[in-house]
Curated annotation (Swiss-Prot):
Keywords: Cell membrane, Flavoprotein, FMN, Membrane, Oxidoreductase, Pyrimidine biosynthesis. GO terms for biological process: 'de novo' pyrimidine nucleobase biosynthetic process; 'de novo' UMP biosynthetic process. The active site is at residue 175. InterPro entries: Aldolase_TIM, DHO_dehydrogenase, Dihydroorotate_DH_1_2, Dihydroorotate_DH_2, Dihydroorotate_DH_cat, Dihydroorotate_DH_CS. The keyword Repressor does not apply. GO terms for molecular function: dihydroorotate dehydrogenase (quinone) activity. This is Dihydroorotate dehydrogenase (quinone). It catalyses: (S)-dihydroorotate + a quinone = orotate + a quinol. Its EC number is 1.3.5.2. It comes from Aliivibrio fischeri (strain MJ11). Catalyzes the conversion of dihydroorotate to orotate with quinone as electron acceptor. Binds 1 FMN per subunit. It is an enzyme of class 1 (oxidoreductase).
Amino acid sequence: MLYRIARAGIFKLDAEKAHDLAIQNFKRFNGTPLDIFYRQNLASKPVEVMGIKFKNPVGLAAGLDKNGECIEAFGAMGFGFVEVGTVTPRPQSGNDKPRLFRLIEAEGIINRMGFNNLGVDNLVENVKKAKYDGVIGINIGKNKDTPIEKGTEDYLICMEKVYQYAGYIAINISSPNTPGLRTLQYGEALDDLLSQLKEKQKELAEKYGKYVPVALKIAPDLEDDELTQIAESLIKYKIDGVIATNTTLDRSMVEGMKHAEEMGGLSGRPVQTRSTEVVRRLKELLGDNLPIIGVGGIDSYVAAKEKMVAGAELVQVYSGFIYKGPGLVRDIVNNI
């Protein structure tokens, strides 16, 4: 009820201004009596995935806390894990504004943010300071001005810098808002990326004396043969997990709605069915070789359960959280 009242005011603001205001307030309220507005004490529902113990299987998807500024606040809401980023080697401002749009009648969001972030070094400092007893995933990407043929270098730079501080590392090659990025999902480009990531992971595991899992985040807009090839590569290179899915370019579910024709990736309820289909197909292809983290349109316990029945061992929320608030986390954790 409280969030529904607050949302009415928040949704009168420009979407990105509302996001920035929320981040500022979470930073301001954290650790003060005012965090009572979002703090939730949830029952422990521990699971072990990728060799990591999670307090519960519900996580915050990347993109909401790009710079790792509010990790404790999201932890206070009951998330079992928080994925920060996407972060790049160097700071970048992202695409021109406006670049974030609500499709309220569909409970969807279109974004073309373009990996706006303060850089990996800033993120690492925030993660180091965070007092959170859950799992922190760090989502990494490439800078827009890095040629795609040199993109792997950006991932390796970020991986080296975040390795000590990450519970797991997510490799984002599926955002539609960085030109050419999705080409890394295919063929030799994918194999080259995965092989170099595994080599770097082995090197860093020996250096720091701990093994940090690596998960690949993929798009929903993949043909079956493309999905099959990705699954084969994930198994071949012994990648630790896969996150399915990122945002979609498909607009068939939102035709005629305000903002539907805006460029960018569509998330929220409109991508729910397709992302679940990808999870289900991945499970068929992967078997028990590696776990799936399901994300895309999860806006209720029922939607989370659908992802898990399809084959996901963990779930993440973002757009559903924007529309439903912290109560969504409670709903899923209590009923899972």
